Amino acid sequence: MKQETVKSSEQLLSVLGTYIDSPVDPFRKERVMFSRGSGAYLFDYDGGNYIDLMNGKGSIILGHNDPSVNAALRNFLEQDREVVTGPSKPIIDLAERIKKDSALPDAKVSFYTTGTAACRAAVYAARDYSGKKIVLSSGYHGWDPMWRQQGPLLEPNEDGVIEFYFIPELLERALTAHKDQVALVIFSPDYTYLSASTMERILGICRAHGVLVCCDDVKQGYRHRQGSSLELVTTEKADMYVFSKGLSNGHRISCVVSSDEIMAETKEHTYTAYYQMLPILSSLETLKKMESGKGYDLIRSYGQTLTGNLKELFVQSSLPIEVNGSSIFQLVFGDEELEEAFYREAFIQGLILFEGDNQSLSLCMDKDVQVDLIRRFANVTDVLSEQFKHLRGKEVTTEQTFRTAWNMIDGASDLLPYEKQLKLLDNLIGGG
C-alpha cells in the first residue's frame, strides 16, 4: 500500500468513532480505502485493482456503480424531483411491488434505512400487536444491543430476547417454558448450512404454539428470487418479512412487510429522511434489471460455476480448504495458520474477501471476471501449497466446519446431531 492510501486511512481513523469494517493491508496493517468501483472491480487511491467478493457485505447485487441505476438517479435529480418534505410517486410503486412479491393478504410496507432498524421495528410492532414481551431469535439481526446474549442458555436477556440458535429442540423448550409470553419468533434463513427440513420444523413448531413469525430476509431476500427466499424451501409463510440488501444495489433502504393489522403498529415509525427518493429509485431500477435480465438465474449459475472451479482448485492444491454454498459461499479451513495466510495472500493477489464470513456474487461476475477470479485464487494456492506443504492431504473436520458456519449464520448448523450441538454451544457461548 502506497503513501496516499496510508494517509487516507489514518485520516479516517482519526475522525470516525465506529469500527472500520474494510480489508486490512497485511504489510502496513492499514485499512484499505477505495477511490472508485466499477462492476466487479474496486480501485484504491494508488491505482491498485481488486475483484470484490465482499460486495458491500452482500448489498451490491448488480455490481458497483451500475450504469442503469446511476442513469436513473441522474435523470431524477436533473428534473428536480427529489423532495424530502413529503411523498412522491416512486414510494408507492416500490411499496406495491414489495407487497405483491410478499403474497401476504392485505399487506402493507414500512420503510427504514438499515436492516438493523427494520428488525428492531418488526420486534416493536409484534410486541405492540400481541401485548407480549419475549422474542425468540436465531441468526444475525444487526448491531443493536437488544440481540446480545448475556446469560445462560434459553434465559432472556435484559431486552427479553432468547436465542435458540436454529435448533428446533431449543425452540420447543423455549416456547414451552415461556408459554403465552412470546410476542415473536424471528430468524434469518440460511441455505448453505441449514436444510429445508430444519426450517420447516422451526415454522411448524411456531405454528403449533400459535406465535407470530418474522423471516429476517435482510441478507437472503431478493437475492435468489423476487421476494422472500423462504419460499425456495417451503410453502409455509411467515407473518412478517424484513428485506434490505437485495433491494437497492447498496443504497440505504430496508422494509418491514406484514398484514394491515400488524403494520398499524408501525404508524409512528417516521424519520427525517423517510421520503428521500434516491434509495427508492435505486430499488425500483435494481428490481427491474434483476427481473427483466433473468438476474437471479444468472447469479445462481455464476455461483455454481465459480464454486465448482474453486473446489477443483483446492483439491488440486491438496490443502485443507473447502467451499460451501454457491452464489453466497463460505471458505472453510482445516488449519488456523493456513486461514490467516490465505486471506493475507488473497489481498496481495487483489481479492477483497469477507474474512471468516460469506462471499457474495453480483450480476456483473460474468465469464471474463470469473477467469480473472480463478487466476487470482490460483496464485494464492500456488504460494500457499509450498508454504503449507506439511498440511497436504489433511481434511477439514466436521467440527471445524460447524465452528466456521457459526461465524456466518450466528447459530448452529445441521452438520451435527442435537447432543453434539449442545456440547459445542457450551464452548461457543457458555450455555447450559
UniProtKB/Swiss-Prot annotation:
To which pathway does this protein belong?
Answer: Antibiotic biosynthesis; butirosin biosynthesis
Any Pfam family matching the protein: Aminotran_3
The UniProt record lists the EC number as: 2.6.1.93
Q: Please indicate if the UniProt record lists Cytoplasm as a keyword.
A: no
Annotated positions of the N6-(pyridoxal phosphate)lysine modification = 245
Q: Which domain of life is it from?
A: Bacteria
Q: Which PROSITE patterns match?
A: AA_TRANSFER_CLASS_3
* InterPro entries cross-referenced by the UniProt entry: Aminotrans_3, Aminotrans_3_PPA_site, PyrdxlP-dep_Trfase, PyrdxlP-dep_Trfase_major, PyrdxlP-dep_Trfase_small
One GO BP: antibiotic biosynthetic process
Which terms are listed as keywords in the entry? Aminotransferase, Antibiotic biosynthesis, Pyridoxal phosphate, Transferase
One of the entry's Gene Ontology molecular-function terms is: transaminase activity
Q: Which reaction does it catalyse?
A: neamine + 2-oxoglutarate = 6'-oxoparomamine + L-glutamate
User: What cofactors are annotated for this protein?
Assistant: pyridoxal 5'-phosphate
Family that this chain belongs to: Belongs to the class-III pyridoxal-phosphate-dependent aminotransferase family.
General function of this protein: 6'-oxoglucosaminyl:L-glutamate aminotransferase that catalyzes pyridoxal-5'-phosphate-mediated transamination for the conversion of paromamine to neamine in the biosynthetic pathway of butirosin.
Q: What is this protein called?
A: Neamine transaminase BtrB
Q: Which gene encodes it?
A: btrB
